[in-house]
């Protein structure tokens, strides 16, 4: 049975909202930069809320994504879902770290759907880092 929404909430509370567990500082900076770079490609004409995300796999590969809005709300896609989709498309199935880049000075927490996606591809100890401008 796949992990549930509450499973991820427990995990996020346990490791803290901001963490650098098991990552060297420069590696976290590189992953954060990928998330902010992806954010620049956001298609968000309705909310103007540009989000980027980047995932790191156990093999060291990185994948990024941005949010893509649609006039047919709620058919848009979150940055986390795009990054995870890119990862899966390339044959990877595990996340060892994920960074979510906010477009302003507040943290952008994953929505319920993205929390579920993260939980399905990430072990309990996976850090979820939120970055702000």
Residue ranges and their predicted role:
Residues 9-37, 110-113, 117-133:
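Zinc-dependent deaminase
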Residues 39-45:
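Short helix-to-loop capping/linker segments positioned immediately adjacent to catalytic or ligand/cofactor-binding
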Residues 64-133:
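Zn2+-dependent cytidine deaminase-like catalytic core
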Residues 48-57:
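Short beta-strand scaffold segments in enzyme catalytic cores
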């Amino acid at each position: 049975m796949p992990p549930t929404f509450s499973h991820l909430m427990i995990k996020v509370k346990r490791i803290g909202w901001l963490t650098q567990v098991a990552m060297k500082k420069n590696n976290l900076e590189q992953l954060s930069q990928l998330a902010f770079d992806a954010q620049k490609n956001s298609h968000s004409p309705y909310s103007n809320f540009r989000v980027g995300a980047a995932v790191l796999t156990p093999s060291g590969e990185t994948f990024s994504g941005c949010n893509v809005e649609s006039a047919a709300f709620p058919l848009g896609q979150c940055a986390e879902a795009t990054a995870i989709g890119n990862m899966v498309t390339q044959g990877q199935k595990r996340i060892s770290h994920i960074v979510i880049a906010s477009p302003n000075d507040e943290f952008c927490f994953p929505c319920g759907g993205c929390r579920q996606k993260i939980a399905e591809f990430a072990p309990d100890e996976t850090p979820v880092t939120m970055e702000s401008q």
